[in-house]
Regions:
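Amphipathic alpha-helical packing segments from all-alpha helical-bundle domains
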Residues: 125-150, 158-173, 186, 193-197
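Hydrophobic/aromatic residues within well-ordered alpha-helical segments
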Residues: 19, 62, 69, 73, ...
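Hydrophobic alpha-helical connector segments
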Residues: 68, 83-109
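C-terminal peripheral helix-coil segments that are non-catalytic and often amphipathic
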Residues: 1-6, 105, 140, 144-148, ...
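Generic hydrophobic, amphipathic alpha-helix propensity
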Residues: 16-27, 44, 69-77, 81
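Secondary-structure edge/capping motif, primarily at the C-terminal ends of alpha-helices
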Residues: 81-88, 117-121, 149, 175-179
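Amphipathic alpha-helical segments used for helix-helix packing
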Residues: 107-126, 143, 173
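Helix-turn-helix
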Residues: 22, 30-64, 68
Length: 212
């Protein structure tokens, strides 16, 4: 019953949800500026302005917070990407470009988010498997956008889509860290061009007999 008590017009559940939101926001700030290794329970509590004892009501471990922050960014990418696809009329190419635009906007506009999903997750034992799973899932979306007459479930299409996703991630990382300087529209155009070049190659070789 204590969880339903009202304090300041807010229920216990509302206060727990608000504390969780503040912990996630603090995790985003620290993971995106100092790195995952430096994002500790104590540091997150201090950044959130909350007593450390509240942490356990939302997250069993600090790794669970890391995952929650990562998942929140992926959810934003997916939501914005799918909305962009739905709002774009025309060819598969135009819809794919809209999705790539949404991805670039999330990861490059807020550099904290880009650092977490593109850099920090690679070396994290907690986030690494999740990153791979999400890459495979997004590769499936890319395969479906190909517009290819080839079945998107075939091995060749899946490999090409996975290749494209990896290339997109590495390219965005290079832009994020300043290794490549390019304007937004040119970047998205090139990514889209390379995406469809890879998928065209699959169509061109579909049915080719492999000889070893």
């Amino acid at each position: 019953m204590s969880g339903s008590r009202q304090y300041g017009g807010r229920s216990g559940a509302d206060r727990v949800a608000e504390r969780r939101r503040r912990f996630v926001a603090a995790g985003l700030e620290l993971m995106g500026t100092k790195g995952i290794a430096a994002t500790t329970l104590r540091g997150v509590a201090e950044e959130a302005g909350l007593a450390a004892r509240y942490f356990a009501e939302s997250f069993p471990t600090i790794e669970d917070l890391h995952l929650a922050v990562f998942d929140s960014i992926v959810a934003e990418v997916e939501e914005r990407g799918l909305a962009a696809i739905a709002d774009t009329e025309g060819s598969h190419r135009a819809r794919a470009r809209a999705a790539l635009s949404a991805l670039a906007d999330v990861t490059l506009t807020d550099r904290r988010k880009g650092r977490i999903v593109l850099i920090e997750a690679v070396s994290s034992t907690a986030l690494g498997p999740r990153r791979l799973a999400e890459a495979q899932r997004f590769a499936g979306i890319v395969a479906g956008l190909s517009g290819s007459e080839t079945n998107p479930q075939t091995l060749d299409v899946q490999l090409a889509a996975q290749f494209v996703i990896g290339g997109v991630a590495e390219t965005l990382t290079a832009v994020l860290v300043g290794a490549i300087t390019i304007d937004r529209e040119h970047l998205i155009d090139k990514l889209n061009e390379l995406l469809f070049a890879s998928l065209r190659a699959v169509r061109a070789t579909a049915g080719t007999v492999r000889t070893g």
